[in-house]
Swiss-Prot record:
The gene is argR. It comes from Actinobacillus pleuropneumoniae serotype 7 (strain AP76). One of its GO terms (cellular component) is cytoplasm. Its main location: cytoplasm. This is Arginine repressor. Belongs to the ArgR family. It comes from the Bacteria. Pathway: Amino-acid biosynthesis; L-arginine biosynthesis [regulation].
Amino acid sequence: MEKLDKLSEAFKALLKQEKFGSQSEIVTALQELGFENINQSKVSRMLSKFGAVRTRNTKMEMVYQLPAELGVPTTSSPLKNLVVDIDHNDVLIVVKTSPGAAQLIARLLDSMGKSEGILGTIAGDDTIFITPTKVTPVEVLMQNVTELFESSF
């Protein structure tokens, strides 16, 4: 197994433990496993690459965790259950989610792209801002996003 593959496997195994609340804790754990050249910026890139998000574990601690499913999430997954509210103003749409779910849902919305009227998204822990393309009225995109999650907001 290549060194990069071993690093990826070790990284995923550590995140599955759901006990690392900071990137420096992950760096230390990987160094203890023999990856001496690991640093915070590499860990940050790996967190992004694997779509990891900070969420609460069973002890209610904020920890890094891998998404339940890798790849592009679909609307057949229980993501729609994570959407709490959808609202808009004249220029953008705001989606409120359960804590820790915004980045995963934003990934789904970003994968839809400009053809569906989405110029881009910005996601925090539990809030997503959606900017429509120039040619898509915000009300139309609001309706499309609402229908996507089969909710009655």
